[in-house]
């Protein structure tokens, strides 16, 4: 087993602790509902996490020099075990919470956590009119204007450079890139979400939401977001996945029994997912650690965060009102 993962297993036992009650939930709002000041503050905080002087790496995992790089590395490390699997939604719920905690603790962010309401905005107009695609240096994530290589050329992230590959190696820096696709944006439409929300069990719902609503949001933005492993390098990844989590919570809130409804495989099937998983971190590195005693996802399944946050179980993240998550969607 990978040495770093072994250390994380040991750390899990030490991290078990009594949590404070969820009495002051963090607010999550649509990006379009944030004030200009809140948008500026959020963007500034994400840039802070990318700055080694302000947010140096906590562990240096995979050669990371910043907390932002560590966030990306945590995702790359387990691509085959957090996509097209039972843990897809729980893992990303915890990942969104970890990113929020880092923004607040490392960079002093105090505002609401934003999501991209793709359904509302897709109904209102084409992708190029989306509220997130704004070239403002303080209130957007870059416009649809790109250079010949697809690199972002305006907004606050023009100087972002990414250095990780899917084998967790550090490589020559590349720009934050995009490749916009209107036909993929249409896969996030509310009618598709409604079909998912009508499903009765978690496995079916997870498969539905993890299909075109998930991939459509990624591929609509494209470029860095096209890559299933490296996509957290784009700040828009977190707004997209926070919206997916919001939709999962809408489904859960319909029936209390859904707060314990989990299932699915622990390992994504097929060559595609095995091909993007780092060769040094195969199935045998993760399956024993997940604590499911097999390939079926259970509430006891451990969510691994590569040392940037404690590792907790799916049971602890199933309810957004839980002590571990403690959020309110507006």
Where in the sequence are the language-model features?
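Intrinsically disordered, flexible peripheral segments
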Residues: 19-330
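Fungal secretory targeting signals
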Residues: 1-21
């Amino acid at each position: 087993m990978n040495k770093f993962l072994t250390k994380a297993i040991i750390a899990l036992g030490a991290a078990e602790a009594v949590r404070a009650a969820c009495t002051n939930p963090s607010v999550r709002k649509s990006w379009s509902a944030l004030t200009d000041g809140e948008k500026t503050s959020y963007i500034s905080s994400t840039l802070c996490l990318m700055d080694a002087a302000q947010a140096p790496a906590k562990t240096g995992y995979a050669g990371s020099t910043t907390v932002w790089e560590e966030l990306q590395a945590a995702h790359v490390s387990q691509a085959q075990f957090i996509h097209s699997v039972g843990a897809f939604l729980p893992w990303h719920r915890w990942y969104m919470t970890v990113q929020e905690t880092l923004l607040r603790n490392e960079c002093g962010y105090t505002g609401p956590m934003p999501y991209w309401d793709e359904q509302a905005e897709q109904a209102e107009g084409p992708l190029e009119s989306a509220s997130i695609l704004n070239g403002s240096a303080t209130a957007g994530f870059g416009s649809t204007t790109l250079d010949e290589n697809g690199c972002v050329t305006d907004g606050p992230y023009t100087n972002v450079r990414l250095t990780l590959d899917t084998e967790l190696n550090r490589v020559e820096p590349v720009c934050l890139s995009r490749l916009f696709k209107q036909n993929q944006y249409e896969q996030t439409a509310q009618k598709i979400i409604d079909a998912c929300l009508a499903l009765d069990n978690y496995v079916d719902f997870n498969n539905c939401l993890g299909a075109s609503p998930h991939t459509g949001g990624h591929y609509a933005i494209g470029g860095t977001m096209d890559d299933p492993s490296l996509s957290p390098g784009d700040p828009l990844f977190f707004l997209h996945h926070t919206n997916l989590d919001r939709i999962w919570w809408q489904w859960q809130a319909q029936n209390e029994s859904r707060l314990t409804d989990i299932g699915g495989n622990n390992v994504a099937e097929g060559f595609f997912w095995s091909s993007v998983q780092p060769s040094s971190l195969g199935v045998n590195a993760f399956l024993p650690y997940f604590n499911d005693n097999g390939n079926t996802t259970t509430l006891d399944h451990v969510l691994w965060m590569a040392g940037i946050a404690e590792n907790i179980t799916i049971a602890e993240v199933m309810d957004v009102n839980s002590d571990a998550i403690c959020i309110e969607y507006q």
